[in-house]
Amino acid sequence: MNRRTFLKSTAALGAASVATPFIAHGAAREIIIAEPVHSTGYLPMYVAIANGYFAEADVTVKILTIETGAGHTNAVLSGQAFAFIGGPEHNAFARAKGAELRAVVHCVDRGNVYYCAAKGQEPTGTDWGAYLKGKSLAVSQFGGTPNSITRYLLKKWKLDAKSDVTLVEVANSAVLAVVKSKQAQIGVSTEPFVTQGVRQSVWAEPFFNVPKELGPYAYSTLNVRLDSIQKDPELVRAFVRGMVKGLKFTYAQPDAAADIAKKQFPTMPLEDLKATLDRSFKDELWSKDGTISRAAWDTGSAVVRDAGILKSDVKYDEIIDMSFVESVRTSL
C-alpha cells in the first residue's frame, strides 16, 4: 500500500469517530492537515513534522491528501481535518457561504505556478495573449489556485477563458500526463512536476514564472476554523509555532531540508529533486517567518476577484489572523 492510499484509508476508517478536528489522548493530541496535492511546495510543513516541532507540544500531525478543487477545505469545514494548506481565498469562499475560517500561518509566499510549453510549442516572443490564443492549457480544477491565477492572467492578456483558449481542468498531479498525451500544448504546473516534465522532455523550462511576475502572494497558508481559535487557542499556537520553526529550518539548513524531502518523495530521482528545490530557493517560494503580509493577500484577492471566482471584496482581517505568528515570533 502506498503512502497516499494509506493516508486515505486511515482517514476513512477514522472519519466516523472524528467528530472534532482533533483527537485527545490525555495530554497528547493528533490533528489532521489536509493538502490538495503532495508537493515539494509544502516542504516546510513536512520538515516541521519530521523534526518533531509539533511533537514538542505533544501534537501529532498526520497528512491527508485530497485532490479535488475544494476537498481540502471541506475536510476542515466538516471537522475531518484540523487545518488545510491552500490559498486563503478558500476562506473567503467559505465566508460567502456563512462559514468562518482563518489563515493563521504562511507557507508558500509566491504563486507556485509555472507555465510550460510542450516540446515544439515554445513561444518566440512575450506577447502572451497572441501566443496562447487557440491553445489548450492543462490546469488544476476550477477553484484551485493555479486555475484562478490562469483565469486572472488570461483576462490580463485580453483572452476569454471560454472562447479563446481551452482549459483542460484536471488534478494537479495529472497536468504532466495531459501534456505528455498531447491533449494540451501548455502545462500550468508546480514543482516537482515542472522539473519532471523537463527531465522527461515533455515540456521546456517555464516560459512564464509566476513567483517572479506576481511577487509576494498568499498562495498556501495554513487555515483553521474560527471556532478552533476560540475554543483551543493553545493548540493553534502550538501548531503555528511548529510551522514557523519548519520555515526557518528550511532556509537555514537547506541540505538537511533536502534530506527530509528525499524521504517524502522516495521515487523521485535525486537530480530531479535537487533541481526542484534549487528552483524553489531561487524563487524564494516559502515565507521566511510565517507572516502573511497584507500585500500578499492584496495580490491573492485581486487574482480571484478579477478571475470572477470571488464576487465580494473580503478584507484581510476577515480571513487572516496573524496574532499567533506574532505571539511566537519573539521566542524563536
Residues of each region from the PLM?
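Stable alpha-helical elements in mature extracytoplasmic
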Residues: 41, 50, 69-72, 90, ...
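Secondary-structure end/capping motifs
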Residues: 230-311
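Conserved C-terminal helix/tail region of periplasmic/extracytoplasmic solute-binding proteins
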Residues: 301-332
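Short, glycine-/small- and polar/acidic-enriched structural segments
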Residues: 27-160, 166-169, 183-191, 207, ...
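Short, solvent-exposed loop/beta-turn-alpha elements that line the ligand-binding surface or hinge
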Residues: 56, 130, 211-213, 282-293
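N-terminal export signals
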Residues: 5-26
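Sec/Tat-exported extracytoplasmic proteins
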Residues: 80, 85-88, 95, 139-141, ...
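Pocket-lining segment of extracytoplasmic ligand-binding domains
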Residues: 174-265
